[in-house]
Amino acid sequence: MTTRKTASSLQLLGKITGTKAGTKQKKMNFINGLIWLYMCVWMVHGKVTQKDELKWNKGYSLPNLLEVTDQQKELSQWTLGDKVKLEEGRFVLTPGKNTKGSLWLKPEYSIKDAMTIEWTFRSFGFRGSTKGGLAFWLKQGNEGDSTELFGGSSKKFNGLMILLRLDDKLGESVTAYLNDGTKDLDIESSPYFASCLFQYQDSMVPSTLRLTYNPLDNHLLKLQMDNRVCFQTRKVKFMGSSPFRIGTSAINDASKESFEILKMKLYDGVIEDSLIPNVNPMGQPRVVTKVINSQTGEESFREKMPFSDKEESITSNELFEKMNKLEGKIMANDIDPLLRKMNKIVENERELIQRLRPLLDLKKTAISDDSFQDFLSMNANLDRLIKEQEKIRQDAKLYGKQTKGHDEIFSKISVWLALLIFIMITLAYYMFRINQDIKKVKLL
């Protein structure tokens, strides 16, 4: 941020001095601006750690463009397309009006563990509405070799495109598109999977785009603009066996916008700057839209997130309202058939009851008569049993009395017999003693 403020102040100072000085002073300002540009590039890429140096793949990176003397030899790894020019240490992709250009790395790159690509770019000389833009490519396969899509590819390409362009409603923005090569990509209607706002037009200070892809970290894909996170996702998975074609392209339509590439570095891994936490996310404006209820005509204002023309976002209250409406419709759709079925069942039950009622009445009458007759016969049987039981009880009483009289007579006879036996035994004893006494007397 400090470098941008300093650059803007120097630019303002250059304009003031230019109005006072004249043509010679303008030339001096141009030279000073060029020196300042080189200083900014050095400041942007001056902080590189030793670990990052070990990961730096110089064979797949641009050389120091300020030191290039033999383009055919030192830039043999790169393909320059259309109107690209190497001027004063930078590639100018669009050197004039209605021009386009591209810069492609000739050898294809295969990811071993992870990769990080850093592009240093600048848009200079124009600010305003334009249909042009700057695209950065990460393609797989041979699809899309034409230049109909921002000077770099056909509409049928397989891979990733990161596009910087001016949106008519929201201004300067960065959008990311994916395509599998089976269908045409239309910038106006095709959906993008990520986006952020980024001011890049007519800037004295170059900007840095850093793209990191790490398959080992659950396919982390992360884009940083000037060390601020534009987006990161783990839902994008590239084909591991297919190598990548890396490049950039631009088109400026009818404007004088000059898209410039100052540096490109490729690292075989994740560098330390890629791990900067997202503590200062890129700001996004709020868009207020007037919504008119088609049923009631009521007007309301709703905030939408950026880039919500294709995919509208809704607030929590609106989400709850829609859920309540959906729940009501579901309940209504569920209850109405149930009510109809219940009413039909009730009608069937009523009809069945009406048909069974005469049969039930006849059965009830027959059951009542039979039950009454059975009750009377049972009562008569009970009376007969009671009488028989009473008669048996009386007979038992009489038999009991008779048995008791006999027992008394037998007991009296037994007493007299016992007494008689005792008397007889006593008499026999005395007679025996008398006989013994008589025998003793005779002996004497």
From Swiss-Prot:
Quote the gene name from the UniProt entry. Answer: EMP46
- Keyword Nucleotidyltransferase, does the record have it? no
Q: Report which residue ranges the record marks as coiled coil.
A: none
Q: Does the keyword Coiled coil apply?
A: no
GO cellular component, as recorded: COPII-coated ER to Golgi transport vesicle; endoplasmic reticulum; endoplasmic reticulum membrane; endoplasmic reticulum-Golgi intermediate compartment; Golgi membrane
Top-rank taxon of the source lineage equals Eukaryota
| Entry GO MF terms | carbohydrate binding; D-mannose binding; metal ion binding
The name this protein carries in UniProt is: Protein EMP46
- Tell me which parts of the chain lie in the Lumenal compartment: 47-408
Any one GO biological process: protein transport
